Regions:
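Short, polar/charged alpha-helical segment
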Residues: 20-40, 157, 161-165
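Short, well-ordered beta-strand elements
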Residues: 9-21, 39-45, 143-148
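Short helix-initiation/N-cap motifs at beta->coil->alpha
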Residues: 40-55, 173-185
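C-terminal motif of bacterial Sec signal peptides marking the signal peptidase cleavage site
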Residues: 2-3
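Contiguous mixed-secondary-structure segments that line small-molecule binding/active-site clefts
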Residues: 69-165, 169, 174, 178, ...
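Hydrophobic residues within well-ordered alpha-helices
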Residues: 57-58, 138, 186-188
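The structured alpha-helical core of multi-pass membrane proteins
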Residues: 50-56, 61-66, 228
């Protein structure tokens, strides 16, 4: 008796990792494919982390999902990150694109338009008062600032120690280490003056906070990019039309608003994505 693989679906299958932003991006990709191709799209969201999504791609259980270039480079491709100051987003993207094609026959689509990286965040009234837009600008003022960080950021090799060295940052006392969920409350309550967060966190938008630009490119690039199996693109070339339509269309502010709508307002990701697409002429 010959063992047969399960039949492939007659329609594209879009996956996602297991957090809100990923479900939103998976839904965005699915809706855009449906709108531009009139294909039926199956959703398989919340598939745990990058490794599970990659295995699902290789097995043909999903045809596409959205990944982040720095994660793809280190977690999937097992490549070392360039040294701080040499982490050009285009160079990282080119390496990821080349190796995914060589190793896995997976196409890396055009970036959606935003990074989800670490971010140093301050209150907007402080940003205006001190005229701060970049971390380089902030270095002169950090001796008067109290810092709040999550446990991981304090320990990571690409976290606080390296960041402080790259920018010459000194703070008013040791950092206050706390659960990530408490950082924004501490910042709003003036218990700290700067926090280490993530660029697409919903509270940044909800509380009108300011992200200081990483102008020396210390943090690795984590551009959001769609990954699609070559076989799926050959079978449904209309998918490429959807990828091209989404290229550069999602800003970090857009992502914060959508994340906050789902997490903070408990709205359905599909509804949030439909509103985003309508507002942006997609």
């Amino acid at each position: 008796m010959i063992a047969c693989a399960p039949p492939r679906p007659s329609h594209p299958v879009i996956g996602s990792k297991n957090f809100t932003e990923q479900a939103v991006l998976g839904e965005l990709l699915a809706q855009e494919i449906e709108a531009t191709s009139h294909l039926k799209v199956e959703r398989r969201f919340y598939l745990a982390g990058s490794y599970i999504c990659q295995q699902a791609m290789l097995a043909g259980r999903i045809d596409a999902y959205v990944e982040y270039t720095g994660t793809a480079l280190t977690a999937i491709l097992k490549q070392p990150l360039p040294q701080p100051g040499h982490r050009d987003p285009d160079a990282v993207l080119a390496t990821v694109r080349r190796l995914y094609q060589q190793r896995y026959q997976i196409a890396v689509g055009p970036p959606l338009g935003f990074d989800n990286s670490f971010a140093m965040v301050i209150r907007s009234d402080d940003a205006r008062r001190l005229r701060l837009t970049t971390l380089s600008h902030a270095a002169a003022d950090t001796p008067h600032m109290r810092l709040g960080v999550g446990y991981e950021f304090e320990q990571r090799p690409d976290g606080l120690r390296g960041l402080s060295a790259a920018y010459g940052l000194r703070f008013n006392g040791p950092p206050r280490t706390m659960d990530l969920g408490l950082l924004y409350r501490a910042l709003n309550d003036h218990q700290v003056d700067m926090i280490a967060a993530n660029t697409t966190d919903g509270p940044i938008q909800a509380f009108h906070l300011t992200v200081l630009q990483d102008d020396r490119h210390y943090f690795p690039p984590y551009q959001a990019v769609p990954l699609v199996r070559d076989e799926a693109l050959r079978r449904w070339p209309q998918i490429q039309t959807a990828l091209d339509a989404l290229a550069g269309r999602v800003t970090a502010d857009d992502m914060r608003v959508m994340n906050e709508a789902v997490d903070g307002q408990h709205r359905d990701p599909a509804e949030v994505v439909r509103e985003f697409r309508a507002a942006h002429g997609l």
